[in-house]
UniProtKB/Swiss-Prot annotation:
Highest classification ranks of the organism: Bacteria, Pseudomonadati, Pseudomonadota, Gammaproteobacteria, Alteromonadales
Cited function: Catalyzes the synthesis of alpha-ribazole-5'-phosphate from nicotinate mononucleotide (NAMN) and 5,6-dimethylbenzimidazole (DMB).
Protein name: Nicotinate-nucleotide--dimethylbenzimidazole phosphoribosyltransferase
Domain of life per record: Bacteria
Positions of the catalytic residues: 318
Length: 351
């Protein structure tokens, strides 16, 4: 499994003092200050002399995990499962929102096939980490065998290690999969032991009648498996998705290696919830990009004591919110590294 250390807090006062001594009123950079503190804590390696080392973001990488869901065949979405493969093809061609935003902000983009129904053939730039051809319909059977969760975690560990080996110290998580808001809703409901109705949202933009069907089937799934939902891994196996499994594994793998993870929207945050339940220490490494319009996302963020960087009304997924957050993360790094202190600038200290 994953061995994750909490970030060291013994130098928090030193880091905060450095932030406070920048040429600004106390706290005037708002959330960027807490973000800089978090990044500095993550990148601190135990030697107090290293506090003078500039923070840095190197080779930031967006990982988009794609998979299909058996429940999608039962009327929970306005889009058929074929759209998953079509959108993965769009990613490969560079035409999706995530491609545009990654190019704009400087993210390397990698697409991972975790188990779409119709895999693309001959695409070297789609990473094959397939756990199957879509999950089973979770209201009729377990979404996947338990061993697929362990396999997905190992795939994710290897993926993250490969990027760290070439100098990446920040990953962001996105996803694509018709039906995955249903899986994320079920995971959230089971993990937090709260009603589906508090978690479920409109996903691709479903109408009221479809929302009723979606809610009913998720409740059926949770009722069917209620005696088996005994651990985070079991919850993933019975009502999760292949991409949610691998995002969870990627979070844990990145935290184990002490690098930052930028969490996108509702689906990625559901994976973050599972990761934090498995390893509370992993929470230290997570930056939450935005609050989406999915009903359950705000509650998920509250449960994780997360203040997102953005609130733009997004509900696209793909990692789009995480991509848009990268300039803010870089801004936090840059002010920490480059902004003058009161002493340096010869400015009266107003702190």
């Amino acid at each position: 499994m994953f061995v994750i250390e909490a970030v060291k807090s013994d130098v928090d006062a030193n880091i905060q003092h450095k932030i406070n001594q920048k040429t600004k009123p106390l706290g005037a950079l708002g959330q960027l200050e807490s973000l800089a503190l978090q990044i500095a804590r993550v990148q601190y390696r135990g030697d107090k002399q290293s506090l003078s080392t500039p923070l840095q973001i190197t080779k930031p990488t967006m990982l988009v995990f794609a998979a299909d869901h058996g429940i999608a065949a039962y009327g929970v979405s306005i889009a058929p499962s074929e759209v998953t493969t079509q959108m993965v093809h769009n990613f490969v061609q560079g035409g999706a929102a995530i491609n545009v935003f990654c190019r704009q902000v400087g993210f390397e983009l990698e697409i991972i096939d975790c188990g779409i129904l119709q895999p693309l053939t001959g695409q070297a730039n789609v990473i094959d980490q397939r756990l199957g051809a879509g999950t089973k319909a979770m209201h009729l059977a377990a979404a996947m065998p338990l061993e697929k969760v362990a396999q997905g975690f190992e795939f994710a560990r290897q993926l993250v290690a490969r990027h760290i080996d070439v100098g990446c110290n920040l990953i962001a998580l996105g996803e694509m999969g018709i039906g995955n808001t249903s899986a994320a809703t079920a995971v959230m409901s089971a993990m937090l032991n709260i009603d589906v109705e508090q978690c479920v949202g409109r996903g691709t933009g479903i109408d009221d009648a479809t929302l009723v069907i979606k809610t009913k089937l998720i409740n059926q799934a949770l009722d069917l498996h209620q005696h088996e939902l005994v651990s985070p891994e079991a919850i993933l196996a019975h009502v999760g998705g292949f991409e949610i499994v691998q995002m969870t594994g990627a979070i844990l793998a990145a935290a184990e290696q002490k690098i930052l993870v930028v969490i996108d929207g509702f689906i990625a945050t559901a994976a973050a919830l599972v990761a934090v339940k498995l390893s509370p220490q992993s929470r230290d490494y997570l930056v939450f990009a935005h609050e989406s319009q999915e009903q359950g996302h705000k509650l998920l963020l509250q449960q994780l004591q997360a203040t997102p960087l953005l609130s733009l009304g997004l509900r696209l997924g793909e990692g789009t919110g995480a991509a848009l957050a990268l300039p803010l993360i870089q801004a936090a790094v840059n002010f920490y590294n480059q902004m003058a202190s009161f002493d340096d600038a010869g400015v009266n200290n107003v702190v």
